[in-house]
Structure formats: structure tokens, C-alpha cells
A protein has these predicted regions:
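Substrate/ligand-engaging "lid" and interaction regions
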Residues: 1-42, 46-537
Length: 537
């Protein structure tokens, strides 16, 4: 069995292997899409293929949509050459369920794959043709937050961005210049409206995308490459909108175990490849089942019926509330607690931590118990149901290869949102945050983690963090097994509003965190003992 249009003719074999096939005519959908594209997507990687491709597949299957998605890769052209075109743009979607079983389905909704290479005439001319089509309704993105960045920390444009600014719109290279140039093409072809939708997992994603596109356009205007009228066109949200969105679906790299099971079913040529840009990608995509996509409903040229495939269409304020619910209460704070304690207690898989009585109890306390009284309720999703699914379905999923070490990366940049917002809400509601028990325990766990010594007293490597040098320097005289070596070294960290968004002493929990920390450095097994003492009724 081969994952190609020819290979799908062997319908019985696929059926016997328990793999669902599209109910629609894939070639006809591709033909219609090429003639009259309505949806272009930039960033042809895994989350796009299984989640966004799955949405389109659902809509085509139900007759809500006649056309698929035009997929554009802006960074790693090997993806098109090695994963799209040899497999006729098909994708084998594998859903990894919490009970260890899988659901498998072929998606035929990715109608065309194009490389955003302005120096290759057939690729670039095709993109210009698509953007000139007045019926194009939306372009969407999963290029990661880095794809929108134009400047480095020094405030100067990255050299490759500066090159795009200096060059004319005819030969762009970076994603933002490519999109800006194609919007200029659309403007010149008659100024048809368009929705430009970021689906990347970062807050205020639509604003970030809009700022980058506008910056590029204004730089080109200064050089006389584009007109002020073009800048006005993309500045007018009734012409070119930049809806905000919230996306949530864990899509790990292709798993070896999944690849083996597909090969055992008789599927050929399904193994992952490593591209020249170091992308690890396969003809199949594996991901968890739960998925959320919430989009601000602002589409000036119409849109597919996305809500009929489970997408929540709403206003900008609600998108923001869902994002806030997820990152400040229902998912991210739980992840960070498991990350820091997982490293200190010797875990290498987040899912395994949920079998640990104390750590399981800790996330129950942080989310449902302490988070819920002050949670941002978006109205369209139940925070209680969301956090329940996170704790009972998503984090314990044995297929999820997430490690505490990866999630512990950049924790100093995350604790302000993940814990600081709840602490501030308690101060606003109750005058202080002294009611909190589990969140101070999570913060104490992070401080204990920063010693780089596990609960047995053995050293481990700390994950990267922009504040690591500063934080470890503050704690350099604290010695594992010597409680008396603690002489207030945490004060500079816990009172730092740049880290937590609030001085934790003013919130009434700084001293409590210090006490917990001192208990946790007492010697081997002290972290486990402290968790037990503080997480029993």
C-alpha cells in the first residue's frame, strides 16, 4: 500500500488496515482549488497538515466546501519536494489516544503545494496568479512566532530582513516580505479584500503579523518601491483584516512506534525524513485528539463555514479570554509545575509524572482548586471542562513525548503569566494571596530547580533561560543539604516585578515560598517530603 492517489485505489486494503479514506473525489477537489483558490496557508508543517488540513477535510466531506487548501512553504522547500509532491499532497493523520490506541485517516484536502521561491518563475508566478484572484478569501499561517520577527534584541533588522527591505518586492526571501509582496500584487490587481489569519501559538498573534507586514510595507514605501495607497489598503481592516486566534493541539514529531505500526500494516515509504534545514517530518502526522481553534470572525471577503468543523468563531475579546484561560490557569501553569519538579525528581516524560501521587495532586490544586475562583471565563468554552481534559486526558497521554526538561526552558519568562496573573487576581479579590498553597509550592519548586541538583543530591543540567546567569548567581551560596546556607538569597528573585508581575512579598506569599524552599534543600528526599507534607488534607 502506498500513500499516493494510485495507491488509494486499493480501497479494500486500506479498509482492512483500519485506515479511513476521503469520501470525496480528491483529484476533482484539487482541480477546482487550482482553478479558483479560496484559502492559502503558509507554513506547511505538521500542525497545519493534521489540524487545519483536518478542518478542510471535514468541510469538504460534508459538502460545505468544494475546494481544498493551497499550501505554501516559506522556509524549508524540501518539505514540498520530499513530503508533499511524491505523495500527491496526501497526508496520513494519526490520532494518538490517551488509552494507547490510534485512529488513522488519509486527508485529501491539501490541494496544491507551492514553494515561496521568488527566484523560481513557475513557483512565484503561480503565487502571484493566486493572490490576484478576487475570490481568494483567506490566507493563514503556522510559521511559528519567529517567522514574524523582523528585528534582533539590539533593535536592528536581521540582515536577511534588511536585504528584503533593500531589494524590491519582486524578489523577497523572508516570509513577511513574501506575503507583503503578494499583497502588493493583490492591491495592483484590483484591491480585493482578504483576511490574513495567524494561527500560530502566541498571544495577540494577529497584531504581531499585522505589525510585521505593515513595517515591511512602510520601509518599501520610503524607498519608493510601493505607494502610500498600498500602505493604506493593508492598514484598513475592512479591506485587509488580521483576525486574532488561539490554537491548541499538541503535535509531536513523527514517532518511531507509529511509523513501525504503519509499516506493519503494509504501508510503504512512510518513514520520516530529515530535510536539509533539519526538519524532521514524515508522510504521516501524529497528534493528540483534543484540539481547539478560536478565531476572531472578521473576514472582509467571506470565508469557509469553519464553525461547522469545530472552529469557534467569535470576537477579539473572547479570543483573548480563551488564550488567557489557557495560559494563566488551565494548561500552562500545570505544565511548568510538572516541568520543574519533574527535573528535580528525575522524570524524563511529562505523562509519567501524572502517575506520581504528589505531582498529580499538585496540578489538581493549581488548576481546579486555586485557579478556578479567579479564572477568565470566555463563555464559549468551559474552563472546568478544559482543565479536566488537560489533567485526565491530555497530560497523561503516554504517546505525548513531552519532557519536563523541554518545558522548563525559559521559565523566568513564563512565571509572570503562568502564576503572577492568578496571584494578582487573588490580591485584587481577597486583599492578598495568602490562601494559595500549591502555587507557592510550584514557585518554590522552580527556585529549588535552579540549584541544578536533584532530590538525590546529584547534579543535572538546567534548561536554557535568558535569566539563567543572573538567577543562578543569586543562589550561588545556597548549598544542598545545608539549610543554614540560606540567608535570604531568594528575596531579590521573589520581589522582582519584572519576573512575576508583582512583588510576592507584597502579595503575602514571599515568606511562605522561602520556608518551602528551605525545607526542599534540607538533603536527599527533602523535595518529596515537602510535597507530601503540603499536599495532604
Amino acid at each position: 500500500m502506498k500513500l499516493t492517489l494510485q495507491g488509494l485505489q486499493e480501497k479494500e486494503q486500506w479498509k482492512n488496515a483500519g485506515i479511513g479514506l476521503p469520501s470525496y473525489d480528491i483529484e476533482k477537489v484539487a482541480e477546482e482549488t487550482k482553478k479558483n483558490p479560496v484559502w492559502v496557508h503558509f507554513g506547511a508543517g505538521n500542525i497545519f497538515r493534521i489540524f487545519i488540513g483536518g478542518i478542510a477535510d471535514t468541510l469538504i466531506s460534508s459538502g460545505e466546501m468544494k475546494k481544498g487548501i493551497t499550501c505554501v512553504e516559506t522556509f524549508d522547500f524540501d518539505v514540498v519536494d520530499k513530503i508533499y509532491r511524491p505523495y500527491d499532497n496526501l497526508v496520513l493523520a494519526v490520532t494518538l489516544k490517551a488509552d494507547g490506541s490510534t485512529d488513522k485517516k488519509v486527508l485529501g484536502s491539501l490541494a496544491e503545494a507551492i514553494k515561496a521561491q521568488s527566484e523560481v518563475p513557475e513557483e512565484w508566478d503561480r503565487l502571484k496568479e493566486i493572490f490576484s484572484d478576487k475570490n481568494l478569501q483567506m490566507i493563514s499561517f503556522t510559521i511559528t512566532e519567529k517567522g514574524y520577527a523582523l528585528k534582533g534584541v539590539d533593535g536592528n533588522y536581521f540582515p536577511f530582513i534588511q536585504k528584503d527591505i533593500d531589494n524590491r518586492p519582486e524578489k523577497p526571501v523572508s516570509a513577511m516580505a513574501v506575503v507583503c509582496a503578494l499583497l502588493y500584487e493583490r492591491f495592483q490587481a484590483g484591491k480585493a479584500p482578504l483576511a490574513v489569519v495567524s494561527m500560530d501559538n502566541c498571544s495577540h498573534n494577529g497584531e504581531k503579523l499585522r505589525n510585521s507586514i505593515l513595517t515591511m510595507a512602510k520601509e518599501w514605501e520610503k524607498k519608493g518601491y510601493v505607494t502610500g495607497e498600498f500602505v493604506n489598503y493593508i492598514s484598513d481592516e475592512d479591506q485587509v483584516s488580521f483576525p486574532w486566534s488561539m490554537i491548541d493541539k499538541i503535535t509531536p514529531r513523527p514517532a518511531e512506534s507509529v511509523c513501525r505500526s504503519l509499516e506493519e500494516l503494509g504501508i510503504e515509504d512512510i518513514a520520516p525524513v530529515i530535510t536539509s534545514k533539519n526538519t524532521y517530518i514524515a508522510p504521516f502526522v501524529n497528534a493528540e485528539g483534543p484540539q481547539y481553534l478560536v478565531i476572531e470572525d472578521h473576514f472582509p471577503n467571506g470565508r469557509p463555514a469553519l464553525e461547522k468543523a469545530g472552529v469557534y468563531m467569535t470576537d477579539r475579546d473572547t479570543v483573548n479570554k480563551v488564550e488567557r484561560m489557557k495560559v494563566t490557569t488551565c494548561l500552562n501553569p500545570l505544565h511548568t509545575a510538572l516541568a520543574v519538579y519533574g527535573c528535580v525528581l528525575g522524570y524524563t516524560l511529562i505523562a509519567d509524572e501524572m502517575k506520581d501521587e504528589e505531582l498529580n495532586r499538585l496540578v489538581h490544586e493549581i488548576g481546579p482548586v486555586e485557579g478556578m475562583p479567579v479564572v477568565t471565563d470566555p463563555g464559549i468554552l468551559s474552563p472546568e471542562a478544559f482543565v479536566d481534559e488537560v489533567i485526565n486526558v491530555r497530560i497523561p497521554n503516554p504517546f505525548m513525548p513531552d519532557t519536563p526538561q523541554r518545558i522548563a526552558t525559559d521559565t523566568s519568562q513564563k512565571v509572570g503569566i503562568r502564576y503572577g496573573e492568578t496571584i494578582k487576581a487573588y490580591v485584587a479579590q481577597y486583599g492578598d494571596a495568602k490562601k494559595l498553597k500549591a502555587i507557592p509550592l510550584a514557585i518554590a519548586g522552580w527556585c529549588r530547580y535552579l540549584l541544578g541538583v536533584d532530590d538525590k543530591g546529584e547534579k543535572f543540567e538546567l534548561s536554557s533561560d535568558p535569566m539563567l546567569a543572573e538567577l543562578t548567581a543569586a543562589l550561588k551560596d545556597v548549598k544542598f543539604g545545608e539549610k543554614e546556607s540560606y540567608t535570604g538569597q531568594l528575596k531579590s528573585i521573589l520581589s522582582n516585578e519584572n519576573i512575576f508581575g508583582i512583588d510576592l512579598y507584597k502579595a503575602g506569599i514571599g515568606e511562605k515560598i522561602e520556608e518551602l524552599f528551605v525545607k526542599e534543600i534540607a538533603g536527599p528526599g527533602a523535595v518529596r517530603k515537602t510535597l507530601k507534607e503540603n499536599l495532604t488534607d
